[in-house]
Each structure stands twice: as C-alpha cells, then as structure tokens.
Amino acid sequence: AFLYGVGLQFKMDIRSRTMLVTCYLVPLVFFFFMSGIFISVDPTATETLIASMSVFVVTMSALIGVPPSLGEVYGGEVKKVYRANGVPLYLGVITQFLSSFVHTLIACLIVFAAAPLAFGAELPENVPLYFCALAALLCVTLAVGCLLGLSIKTQAKQTMAAMIVFLPSVMLSGIMFPAEMLPDFMQYLACVFPATTGFRAMTDFQAWQLPVLAAEFLMAAGAAAVLLKIRAE
C-alpha cells in the first residue's frame, strides 16, 4: 500500500503544473540559458557548473514546488479523505517527499549529463561523493520545503516564505559567484542555509559537511513531525 501511494503521488506530480514548472521547466531553462553566460564571464566556471546548477535545481524544486503541493493535501479535501479512510496523515508528507526526491534527482541527472556535452563542464573529481552530497542536500532542502508547507496554510504566504529562503540560498551559497566576494558577515550568514554547505560538499568535499547536513535534516524533519502531529489533533 505504501509503495502504491508513492507511485500514485509520482504519477500525480507528473501531471502537476507546479511540479513541471518548479522541478523541470524553470530550472532547466535557467541551466541552458545561464550556463553559457557564466562560462563567458568566468571560464573557470566549468569546474563547478554541474554542482552550481544542481543546487539551483534542488532549491527551486524543494522550496518553491513542495510547499504548495503539501498545502493542497493538508489544506483541502485530501486531508478529509485521509481521515475518512483511516490513512495516517504523515503518509502525505512521506509520499510527497519521495516523489519530489525522484523528480528532482531526474532533473539533476539531466544537468549532470548535458553540462559536459553542451558547455564543456568538468565532471566532479569523485562522482560517488558528489552524489552522496547531492542526495544529502536534496533531503535537507525537501525537509525544509515540507516544513514550510506544513507551517503556513495560505499559498500566498507559502510563496513569500519560500522566496525568503530561496533567494539567499541561491545568492549567498556561491553558485552565482564566488562566495569569497561577499562581505565577511554575509559569508557567515550564508552558512545558515543548507545550499551553502551542500555546494561546498559537492565541489570541495570535507568530512564535516555530511554530518552538518544530516543534523540540519533531522532538525527540519523533527519540526515537520511536530507540526504534523499538531495538525492531526
């Protein structure tokens, strides 16, 4: 039943305009449009292009796409259907999380495959570690997206809150320009956002980075679980 629920959510997301726009259309258009500009401005951008664009895909999909989808589940008729049929409310979060994980990973794989062919981007030095860091960042960011979707009921406020997290994640993490160009206090501020640690782990892996991402995931997931329990009462 659980696998059926995940598969059903995956198929529903394929038909969802929100998922299509936030997970595939906008990130991939940004990738194909901006990659050439990045490389023209800074030829060394080929070294980090795959990681930079993957971080953008992850943050766009998880922070902009997930909250409205969860809002539809827990703010509308779906929640009543869950209760009427005795389905645990947490199932909606888990299926949305797993479905979004797969869709976002597919978009990241498109970037991984297309960047070397289209823009001469360099592959990561250690591909397995790169994908471990990508998966960790994806889990953390999806957990934050779920937290936003559960904590804010109206779609307008969800979008506003998501943008408050999304824009600093993109601008301060180092994917648009070297983080060293930022003032010192903004470099410290950037560390608050998972995208910063994730991008560093994907480009210059250090042993401490994955535990930090794991801790951030546990905090976001724990907060989401508390909110879900409150909503269930």
Language model: regions and residue ranges:
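Short hydrophobic, aromatic-rich alpha-helical segments embedded in or entering the lipid bilayer
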Residues: A1-G7, F177-P211
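Alpha-helical transmembrane segments and their short interhelical loops
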Residues: L89, F97-A162, L167, A207-L210, ...
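Short helix-capping/hinge motifs at transmembrane helix termini and TM-loop junctions
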Residues: M34-D42, P67, A115-L123, I152-K153, ...
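Hydrophobic alpha-helical transmembrane segments of multi-pass membrane transport proteins
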Residues: V29, T46-A115
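Transmembrane helix segments
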Residues: F33-S40, S151-V192
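Transmembrane helix-loop junction
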Residues: S35-G36, E72, F112, P116, ...
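Hydrophobic alpha-helical transmembrane segments of multi-pass membrane transport/permease proteins
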Residues: M12-S40, T46-G65, L105-A107, A162-M171, ...
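Alpha-helical transmembrane segments of multi-pass membrane transporters/translocases
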Residues: C23, P27, F33-G36, C132, ...
